[in-house]
Regions:
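Generic N-terminal leader segments that precede the first folded domain
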Residues: 1-13, 79-81, 99, 109-116, ...
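Intrinsically disordered, low-complexity, compositionally biased regions/tails
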Residues: 20, 110, 128-130
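Surface-exposed cap/loop segments at beta↔alpha junctions
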Residues: 25-122
Length: 204
């Protein structure tokens, strides 16, 4: 169906979010309900619908607005019941946080169809002495550790099987002067990849 607008915000070491606006139809109303999962065609990161708002615009057309969070937010529904004290790589510590709270936490606490990736590349994050806060929110613990090591975390979704995988990865340097040989990613009106821009200067 026709989409009025889609804002799909990916984040590197934290949870992304989306906002979708579509014309009101019976099919859209049936599919776009809270807790349903949405994924872009050809994509591998999904999001859960958490907010629905139906409006009538200035032309008299009804529209459905839905918003939600990427599936990394599922980890935020769990806490660390046992403190993690380890000397290991940040990558393995991130796996341990999710394993303890989401995939090897017992039948009552495991998140269905969620597993930990076994094919992630070694990020070379190096060993650290790590001590988690007891009863910390699992998502907050993972995001804090990932940010400290400059690692990306995400939940990948296989749309065909309905399986979800927690993954840790290292970002690529796409700046104009990068030394890794990566093609730079440049946003410019000259390249017609900036539609709108806005500047705000505030003391509040």
């Amino acid at each position: 169906e026709k989409i009025s607008s889609l804002i799909w915000t990916r984040r590197y070491w934290s949870c992304g979010e989306f906002k979708l606006l579509v014309p009101f139809t019976e099919e859209h109303a049936r599919l776009l309900v809270k807790e349903n999962i949405i994924i872009k065609r050809g994509g591998n990161e999904a999001a859960e619908i958490r907010y629905i708002h139906i409006t009538k615009n200035s032309q008299g057309m009804e529209e459905i607005e839905v918003q939600g969070k990427f599936l990394l937010s599922w980890i935020g529904k769990r806490i660390l019941t046992t403190q993690i004290i380890a000397k290991d790589t940040t990558q393995n510590i991130l796996y341990a946080i999710v394993k303890q709270t989401c995939t090897n936490a017992g039948a009552a606490r495991n998140i269905p169809n969620l597993s930990i990736s076994t094919t992630d590349a070694d990020t070379g994050s190096g060993q650290i002495d790590y001590t988690s806060e007891q009863y910390a929110n699992a998502q907050l613990a993972a995001e804090t550790a990932a940010k400290a090591a400059k690692l990306g975390i995400r939940v990948l979704t296989n749309a065909r099987t309905g399986k979800h995988t927690f993954s840790v990865y290292e970002g690529r340097d796409l700046t104009a002067g990068n030394t890794a040989g990566n093609a730079p990613c440049i946003f410019s009106q000259e390249f017609d990849n900036i539609v709108e821009q806005e500047y705000t200067n505030s003391v509040e």
